[in-house]
Amino acid sequence: MARAIMFQGTGSDVGKSVLVAGLCRVARNRGLNVRPFKPQNMSNNAAVSDDGGEIGRAQWLQALACGVPSSVHMNPVLLKPQTDMGSQVIVQGQVRGEARGRYYQELKPQLMAAVMESFARVSEGADLVLVEGAGSPAEINLRAGDIANMGFATQADVPVVLVGDIDRGGVIASLVGTHTILSEQDRAMVRGFLINKFRGDISLFDDGLAAITRFTGWRSFGVVPWLKAVSRLPAEDSVVLERAVRGDKKSLVVAVPMLPRIANFDDLDPLKAEPDVEVVMVPPGSSIPGDAGLVVLPGTKSTIADMQAVRDNGWDRQLSAHVKRGGHVLGICGGFQMLGHHISDPAGIEGHVRDIDGLGLLDIETVMEPEKVVRNVQATALLHNVPLEGYEIHIGRTTGPDMGWPFARIGEHDDGAISPDGRIMGTYLHGVFNADEFRRRFLQNLGVQSSSVNYRAGVEAALDELAEGLEACLDIDALFNLK
């Protein structure tokens, strides 16, 4: 039976996903057969696993760190928020339905069987399984029926390490407070803690570590400094987008409106890695920069609602002005659907609003349909006749005259559309900029000099650098031998 360790946080965005990815690479480098697992994830940043279902992109990255194919069983329950009150529920890669907050709390006990089945599948043939929790175990109002944190840990008898984020302040209180609020049974599952995102001289926190141990009885497994490699890895939580600030002037400014239900925003990461490209996230209430050469409308979990948000923020008028100035626009997935004249949802799949006018930048229309397309694809970008690898996760069928100038060819059918002047493009494919040759040709078309950036190699190098950093600051031997 594989050994397992679960990393739970004192709150969201403490860095659990990246820590688990780095520790997966540490274990792999030590010759262990290691696998990632997250019982429940909430994210619109989904990936298509190697076995053809939807999982969180964090688990996809963790599988890459392990050097193994990704599987739906690595993230058996995925919640994709569609509104402020409800989410689409994905179980073992497939859509189970939709659930509002209270109904989902009632549904969770039924999902534990799927979680435990997937955990058993992931554990087969593994030496070590590194498990990631969700949110915080101190949310005791959600403890009944919990499958994400202590509910899973106690059911599967997996020891827990708590992760505290010192960068946001109050890490001593958050760890000691978690100890105080946990039940005696849950507290017994915790073997210790580690501190993440420390800046400066770590020895200055020695007294802090001693205080946490004095109040809780938990041992410290180490303090992780702010590691630069983390910034070169795909992020899962959209909260990182809110921190983006403009940097030095680059050859090309790419503006990205921050849609309320933005999805798969790691599509932008390869552009951020380009030395002559500045990616500017445009938050609600802000204007699209006038110096942008390209505007990317990203994916979204709720196209109609986010199309209304585009209009409410005045981005529709700003996009029209951008195009009149000679600017380029790329729409990805839901962003592609917004580029057309009209979006209709006769079955109410996305909500009570059944139709909305689009931006009218492409001569296309979209009808939402119940069947969801989820697949990895190999394609050819027709504008440059270069290969692409990407993935589709969408509902809706798009038709119209501009589909006669497709963005890509996938097997026997075409994808996307390009305007007659070539400045407006749309595609259902996520991950297109991961393809180095396509990205270079695309940027050259926008006047940016070709670079030698190999994006996938850069991610692998960042994982290796992260693993090296964790080896230096954590007691890995003690962690990997927890019982």
From Swiss-Prot:
It comes from the Bacteria. GO terms for biological process: cobalamin biosynthetic process. SUPFAM superfamilies: Class I glutamine amidotransferase-like (SSF52317), P-loop containing nucleoside triphosphate hydrolases (SSF52540). The keyword Transferase does not apply. Pathway: Cofactor biosynthesis; adenosylcobalamin biosynthesis. The active site is at 333 (nucleophile), 430. PROSITE patterns: GATASE_COBBQ (PS51274). InterPro entries: Class_I_gatase-like (IPR029062), CobQ/CobB/MinD/ParA_Nub-bd_dom (IPR002586), CobQ_GATase1 (IPR033949), CobQ_N (IPR047045), CobQ_synth (IPR004459), GATase_3 (IPR011698), P-loop_NTPase (IPR027417). Residues 251-438 form the GATase cobBQ-type domain. Gene3D superfamilies: 3.40.50.880, P-loop containing nucleotide triphosphate hydrolases (3.40.50.300). Pfam families: CbiA (PF01656), GATase_3 (PF07685). GO terms for molecular function: ABC-type vitamin B12 transporter activity; catalytic activity. Keywords: Cobalamin biosynthesis, Glutamine amidotransferase. Catalyzes amidations at positions B, D, E, and G on adenosylcobyrinic A,C-diamide. NH(2) groups are provided by glutamine, and one molecule of ATP is hydrogenolyzed for each amidation. Belongs to the CobB/CobQ family. CobQ subfamily. PANTHER family: COBYRIC ACID SYNTHASE, DETHIOBIOTIN SYNTHETASE. This is Cobyric acid synthase. It comes from Brucella anthropi (strain ATCC 49188 / DSM 6882 / CCUG 24695 / JCM 21032 / LMG 3331 / NBRC 15819 / NCTC 12168 / Alc 37). The lineage of its organism: Bacteria, Pseudomonadati, Pseudomonadota, Alphaproteobacteria, Hyphomicrobiales. The gene is cobQ.
